[in-house]
Amino acid sequence: MKRLYPYIPIVVLTPFSHEVSRRIAKEDLSGVDYVFSWLGNVDLLVAIIKLIEDKMNAEVDITSVGVQLILLVEDSIRFYSSILPNLYNFVLKQSQIFSTEALNDHERMLRMRGRPKVMLARTYEEAMQIYEKYSGNMLGIVSDVSFVRAGEKDKKAGIKFCTYVRSCDPYLPLIIESSERENQKEAIKLNASFLDKNSKKLPVDLRKTILKNFGFGDFTFINPNTGEPIVTIKNLKDLQDNIDIIPDDSLYYHASRITYPDGSIRVLFFLWPKPCSLDKLPI
């Protein structure tokens, strides 16, 4: 099928067990784009469609338009089959909240289409390729620790990848997830959040961590010297009412450290009367 229709995505859905996992490991999957563990969750079908759409539209939407990207690095079929529906549900819900400020249906649709993309990497090389290509629009990274690197399973591949990312970008939000608690020490060294894959409330923990670190939800400007909050921006009206009281040093602090999924905050950084020291910020 793949030889006849190379541009049509092919996805395999299978109930998962240890026997199925062993068989898949031995099969030639070169003709398959993705394999997912099917447990009857219909949200997985939506996530698969969105994942394929994001991959196909990434070149134009990210490079040309400036849409941002969340990168998931994970090779466990069972795990990414569980996480992706939760991740997409969260991103779509946040986009719906943002779109409620739209003036009409057309603008609302455009805001929904401008949601952050989600891309899946299953090897070290695939993760590096995506990061190198879209690093300027990366909103955050969620990475496993153990996955394939240079053709073999590397128990520290995720740490090596995140170490490289951190050397390129000191402030990009990183979430390291692992079933081995000792990897939490490595996450702390990289100034990354750590999630235990064995936790029964992992999906909840992931949503909370992304909400806190990836710039979703209400945005609070803080005093960079004291850490005290200055003002919280919930929507464009709040931004308009409080724009005059935000100090330049607070703006510089936030603009130089993170990217934001909320377009109103990014527009603020672009329109602000910038001193010379702000000219090189990646707005």
Task: Go through each PLM region and give its residues.
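Alpha4 helix (beta4-alpha4-beta5 surface) of REC/receiver domains from two-component response regulators
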Residues: 3-4, 12-37, 42-46, 57-59, ...
